[in-house]
Amino acid sequence: MSSIAQKNRNYFLYIFYGRIFNSSDKTFFIIKKQLVIAPNFFSVDQKLICSSELFCGTACSRSLVVLYENYKKIVILNSPQFFAGLDSGRENQSPDGSVQGNGLKWMLFLCQKSKRTIFSNHSNLFQCPSVAIVLVLALVILGVLAAIPLTLMLTSSAQKMSTDSTDLTDYSIRHPKFWPKTDKIHFDDLGGIPMSSMFPPNVSTCSGFGFACTGAVHMVIPSSKRCDGFKDCQDGSDEENCKECQSVFSCRSHIEEDSKKKRKTKVQPTLICLTAERLCNGVQDCLDGSDEAMCKSTCSKDQFKCNGSNACLPLSAKCDGVKDCSDGSDENNCNKCQKGAHVSLVSRNIKHLFASHVCDGVAQCADRSDEQQCDCKTCSGSDKALCDDGTCIKRSQVCDGKKDCSDGMDEENCPGTCSIEAFATKVKRVTCSDGKDYTESEACSGVEESCGGSCSKCHPKLTFTCPAAGNAQKKCIKRSKVCDGIFDCDDGADEKNCTPVKECGIDNASQFTCDRKCVDASRRCDGVWDCEDKSDEQNCSQCASGSIKCSADKKCLPAYTRCNGVAECSDGSDELKCSCEECLGAHSNTYMCSESNRCLKRDEVCSPYSMCPNATYTDKAYCAALVLKNSGRFPY
């Protein structure tokens, strides 16, 4: 987190609406309305801060304030100049009639002290006479005395109020439509949810590194993109107040054009960073015109000329990992890189990476070497995460089911996981075509279609094995897909030797019809779905050994449906009292609730709040982050 963002947490923004009066010896303000904006919803340009003792003492500052709503800038308030959006425009006298004052005004104060200190040491603000002050003090004393019985009553009931039996559910806006029922809301829910609980212990968000955009403090860019000549922040703040440039050319002041008056004006001299595409382009960016004075038709031996431009760059800009020329010609045909740029071999061709592409969370080298040996200085940014092994990845890759860090540390202790060390080594896993890891029993039982061709051996009872022949690869399909009229095997083996439906049961009474195919009666109630409509496992008095029996429905379920997050039995008995091994050891796309024996489908655990009974902070944080991410409002 940036220093500005950290500092803003210690401030509250007070907005007052009323009349202010000034005289030679006093200033007072009659308040009509007051609004307090909580931290993290405003941004402050710390350069413009000035102290004031009108309300909050020396801890109060008046400065440029930017208000946000859902991370979108809604208004910019400039103080100490009053925000006169609702100015009545009338002159009014002070209460004693001696001083002329302005009309209704908005006043802004960014205060570090608590709300109760706003009027401390400023009793003269309202010009109260001493008698009135005495009366106020007397009323305060009477109030304290009257509060004693109430305090005793609350103290005696404090223990009762703090127990888990206290049900705050009626006070929450939660109306569930899906199983399970709403869990009770506790006093802990009144606090904030720490987003740090979303990340594994061996993965860092590198808080405090990078540059926070002034106009959007939630947006952090890597340090490598600060003052490089490109505006990465929407407000361009990453290219302002530069002390040193990463681009090849810089100057101390520049020309700005007034869009209304169509004239160029001189601004306060400051260091600006220019890329080569802004040199010799006919636009004077520097006050002294140096960006347009270095144009030559022929460059010297110690210079490099961009293709299609008259700009001559120093040779140090060649192959330095920074795209200075608009066409990138300064970074082409590189046999050797400078300044930490990276070379990799891809498809037998030398690929030169810009410095900004190294440790950016996206592997562009075949061996992923451009994302290794990174640190928080290089892997900083609101969309990146750093593994303990030095691998830089995108935050969206954390806890996504794929192992991106060595030893899979980015998938450890994620929300919805539990400790399975006792049997983790016994569970065999298969990497399927979608890049995710699945348990072998799940991958090779035909449940996951992306795993059909990834298994060396298919489940003998639950699946049909499509043979490998020619270009056709061996794969596992569900038994219910055999003889269903659809070719699932590449060679059509699943639709061969099938009994026509019209002949089903004529010569062999031990057959029955379902889903346009014949099924042997011996396969009824065996815990395997041979029919797509699952009718072969319904109306069963007994179930085969190893299968699951739904007593309320008289149907049999395959063993792998136990604790898979889907309630197949009408009473939900197949999903009750799930263990960690049953939930995560046998399934891959499941979520184990933190403090219950409930296992849910990971993509169904939030709707939109956590469906876990007795949901913990981690369960709620997971769903809160998911909702914000899906709505495009998550700050990375």
From Swiss-Prot:
Q: Which parts of the chain does the record assign to the membrane side Cytoplasmic? A: 1-130
What GO cellular component is one of the record's annotations? Answer: plasma membrane
Q: What stretches pass through the bilayer?
A: 131-151
Glycosylation, residue list: 202, 508, 614
Keywords, alphabetical: Cell membrane, Developmental protein, Disulfide bond, Fertilization, Glycoprotein, Membrane, Receptor, Repeat, Signal-anchor, Transmembrane, Transmembrane helix
Question: According to its record, how does it sit in the membrane?
Answer: Single-pass type II membrane protein
List the ranges whose topology is Extracellular: 152-636
Name a biological process GO annotation: single fertilization
Any idea what this protein is called? LDL receptor repeat-containing protein egg-1
Question: Which source organism?
Answer: Caenorhabditis briggsae
The coding gene here is: egg-1
